[in-house]
Each structure stands twice: as C-alpha cells, then as structure tokens.
Amino acid sequence: MAANDTISDMLTRIRNACMVQHDNTKVPMTRMTRNIAEVLKDEGFIENYTEAGEGIEKHLVISLKYKGRNRQPIIQKLQRVSKPGLRVYSNHKDLPRVLGGIGIAIISTSKGVMTDRQARKEGIGGEILCYVW
C-alpha cells in the first residue's frame, strides 16, 4: 500500500509497534524517514535502525527501545504537527518547547532534519514535522 504522507505512516508504524511491544518495525525508506530515524536514534528514543531491501522495496528496520521489567516503551507519544494539507513553519525564536524540554520537536530546516534545541542553537527555523516524548 502506497502512503501519501510517509512521515505520518512512519510515526503510526512506530506507535503501533510500541503499543504491542514489538522489538522492531519495518518502515518504507525515504531520505526524510531515514533522517527522522537518525534524530530519534541520536536522542535515545530508538535503539538503532538499519536499511534493508533494494530499489523500490527499500525499507528501514527500526529497533525500538523499552525500559524496566514490564517493558515500558521509551516513546510515550509521537504527534504529527505539519501535515500535507496544513504545513506548520516556525522561526528559531518561536520554536516550541515540548513538555518544558523533556520531549523534542523534530524540525526540517535548510541545514537538514534536527531537533528544536539544535535549531535554536544554530538560529534557524523550519517546518515542524512532529513532537516526540
């Protein structure tokens, strides 16, 4: 099934896999989904990701992270902000703080995909893709 919004598709697959405590999930690969997975890995929300498949069948295998004996998912919530029908942009001064800095906002900027903290530090704004906490 082809998804028009690959970012929402990726976030939904991760959210569903966390709810049923799967160790990993498969996501169709684009440059944007790879960059988002890299940010999630750097921020400690996922264990790792690997690229698999070839050509049109290329996908990411994302290893999810859990804590404690009853395997509580590290990712409590994934929320899509900017959608194909309603894009949300912000300059570096107005970038939101997610849960007072506990969570992150993933921003697509002219210098690539990064967290809200990195964008504020570099003084650049961009499209707010999603919130993660």
UniProtKB/Swiss-Prot annotation:
Protein keywords: Ribonucleoprotein, Ribosomal protein, RNA-binding, rRNA-binding
GO biological process terms held by the UniProt record: translation
Gene3D superfamilies per record: 3.30.1370.30, 3.30.1490.10
A GO cellular-component term linked to this record: ribonucleoprotein complex
GO molecular function: rRNA binding; structural constituent of ribosome
Classification via InterPro entries: Ribosomal_uS8 (IPR000630), Ribosomal_uS8_CS (IPR047863), Ribosomal_uS8_sf (IPR035987)
Residues annotated as signal peptide: none
Complex and partners: Part of the 30S ribosomal subunit. Contacts proteins S5 and S12.
Cited function: One of the primary rRNA binding proteins, it binds directly to 16S rRNA central domain where it helps coordinate assembly of the platform of the 30S subunit.
Family recorded in the similarity comment: Belongs to the universal ribosomal protein uS8 family.
PANTHER family associated with the record: 40S RIBOSOMAL PROTEIN S15A
The protein's name in its UniProt record: Small ribosomal subunit protein uS8
Organism, scientific name: Picosynechococcus sp. (strain ATCC 27264 / PCC 7002 / PR-6) (Agmenellum quadruplicatum)
Gene symbol of the encoding locus: rpsH
